[in-house]
């Protein structure tokens, strides 16, 4: 029942609309709204010659006509708004346009010689890149953004108190140091550097001497026999070479060995019975010490050089 009502209702509404349209056509033969004819002068959507709104005619269209006397959208000679003619006061690019004209006397957007705002001429006080610009000029006496010698703010010269990368005369960056100390440091800077070099060389010589003595003692201990006697009374001196990567602090390598005197831990000789017992109890589960063979190198630290 509901579906039947839904199908009948649109049909009834369409019949009512058709009957009303036929009644209107029978009553008025001249349609003033939907007709696109030429004779009716009171039409609205008609594109004829005398249409007062959307017509593109020659003389009588007051709004959208592009003729000679259109006061709004006409591009003629006397259009006061959107005309690009000689006397347009707003959007005209002529000689006397006071706003958007790019002529000789435009006070705002003109790129002439006497433009006070956006002109790139000689006397522009703001955005001019001339000789006397007080703000954005890159000349000789610019107090703000100039990269000259006497700029007090952003200058990279000799006496800049803020952002200067000078020698050491800046009173702001080196706070807490008086001028006398600064001047003396600057005078004797080379002498201080020489004394520092001498101290570093003396420290290096002491390190070299200590390393040489350590190497001699180690070689003598390795050359001794099992009874504590030195073979033939000779000690083999091994030259010690020191470079910048062999310091005292963090090094890799063999020159930083630590002599371990614990013979039970590192220099023990194992008998056959000890080895057989180890093999019987442990087998291949744990790494066994070398039998009848001493390690070539002793314990070493891993230091960065």
UniProtKB/Swiss-Prot annotation:
Which ranges of residues are annotated as propeptide in this record? 168-305
| One Pfam family in the UniProt entry | FARP
InterPro entries hit by this protein: FMRFamid-related_peptide-like, FMRFamide-related_np
Report the main location listed first in the record: secreted
The record's subcellular locations are: Secreted
Q: Which residues carry this modification: Isoleucine amide?
A: 75, 102
Per UniProt, the keywords (alphabetical) are: Amidation, Neuropeptide, Repeat, Secreted, Signal
Q: How is this protein annotated for GO cellular component?
A: extracellular region
- Any signal peptide, and if so, which residues? 1-19
- Phenylalanine amide modified-residue sites: 36, 47, 66, 84, 93, 111, 120, 129, 138, 147, 156, 165
Tissues expressed in:
Central nervous system.
Q: Report the superkingdom from the record.
A: Eukaryota
Q: Which GO terms describe its biological process?
A: neuropeptide signaling pathway
Q: Which family does it belong to?
A: Belongs to the FARP (FMRFamide related peptide) family.
Explain the purpose of this protein.
Can function as both cardioregulatory hormones and transmitters and may regulate cardiovascular function.
| Name the UniProt record assigns to this protein | FMRFamide-related peptides type HF-4
Biological source species: Cornu aspersum
Lineage runs:
Eukaryota, Metazoa, Spiralia, Lophotrochozoa, Mollusca
């Amino acid at each position: 029942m509901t579906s039947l009502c839904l199908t009948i209702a649109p049909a009834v509404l369409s019949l009512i609309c058709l009957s009303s349209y036929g009644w209107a056509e029978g009553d008025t033969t001249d349609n003033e709204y939907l007709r696109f004819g030429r004779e009716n002068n009171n039409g609205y959507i008609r594109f004829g010659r005398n249409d007062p709104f959307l017509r593109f005619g020659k003389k009588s269209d007051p709004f959208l006509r592009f003729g000679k006397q259109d006061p709004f959208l006409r591009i003629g000679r006397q259009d006061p708004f959107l005309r690009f003619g000689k006397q347009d006061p707003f959007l005209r690019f002529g000689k006397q346009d006071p706003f958007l004209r790019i002529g000789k006397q435009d006070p705002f957007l003109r790129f002439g010689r006497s433009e006070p705002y956006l002109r790139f001429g000689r006397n522009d006080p703001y955005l001019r890149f001339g000789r006397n610009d007080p703000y954005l000029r890159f000349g000789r006496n610019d107090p703000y953004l100039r990269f000259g010698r006497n700029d007090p703010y952003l200058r990279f010269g000799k006496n800049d108190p803020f952002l200067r990368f000078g020698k050491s005369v800046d009173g702001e960056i080196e706070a807490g140091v008086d001028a006398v100390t600064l001047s003396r440091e600057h005078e004797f800077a080379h002498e201080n550097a020489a004394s520092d070099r001498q101290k570093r060389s003396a420290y290096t010589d002491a390190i070299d001497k200590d390393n040489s003595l350590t190497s001699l003692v180690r070689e003598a201990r390795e050359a001794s026999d099992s009874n504590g006697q030195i073979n033939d009374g000779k000690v083999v001196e091994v030259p010690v070479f020191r470079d910048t990567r062999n310091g005292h602090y963090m090094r890799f390598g063999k020159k930083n060995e630590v002599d371990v005197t614990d013979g039970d831990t590192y220099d023990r000789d194992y008998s056959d019975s000890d080895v057989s017992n180890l093999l019987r109890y442990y087998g291949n589960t744990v790494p066994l010490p070398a039998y009848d063979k001493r390690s070539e190198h002793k314990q070493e630290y891993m230091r960065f050089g």
